[in-house]
UniProtKB/Swiss-Prot annotation:
Residues 27-80 form a propeptide. PROSITE patterns: CONANTOKIN. The keyword Cell cycle does not apply. This is Conantokin-P. It is found in: Secreted. Residues 52-66 have a biased composition (Basic and acidic residues). Conantokins inhibit N-methyl-D-aspartate (NMDA) receptors. This toxin has the highest potency for the NR2B/GRIN2B subunit, followed by NR2A/GRIN2A, NR2C/GRIN2C, and NR2D/GRIN2D subunits. It holds the Pfam family Toxin_36. The modification 4-carboxyglutamate is found at E83, E84, E90, E94, E103. Residues 1-26 form the signal peptide. It comes from Conus purpurascens (Purple cone). GO terms for molecular function: ion channel regulator activity; metal ion binding; toxin activity.
Length: 104
């Protein structure tokens, strides 16, 4: 009976000691920093793009950044041009009128 009591207490201690000393679990997964060094070794190095490759172009092979700068300069650095802004305001008015008519 005493032998079973000692084994009952000894087996968990031995397995816990083995897990901590080897740093591995039953399936071979690591508990220590080995896993983190492996993942950093697998990370790809960043690709350095040239300035021309980094910029996107549209269907006509024109630089989108340059086109956007021209558009903003033409609009006076506003988010929308005057025409787009007036169309947006008209749509808002129509929506408000429709809501008022639906409530009545």
């Amino acid at each position: 009976m005493q032998l079973y009591t000692y084994l009952y207490l000894l087996v968990p201690l031995v397995t816990f000691h083995l897990i901590l000393s080897t740093g591995t679990l039953a399936h071979g997964g690591t508990l220590t920093e080995r896993r983190s060094t492996d993942t950093t070794a697998l990370k790809p190095e960043p690709v350095l793009l040239q300035k021309s490759d980094a910029r996107s172009t549209d269907d006509n092979d024109k630089d989108r950044l340059t086109q956007m700068k021209r558009i903003l300069k033409k609009r006076g650095n506003k988010a929308r041009g005057e025409e787009e802004h007036s169309k947006y305001q008209e749509c808002l008015r129509e929506i408000r009128v429709n809501k008022v008519q639906q409530e009545c």
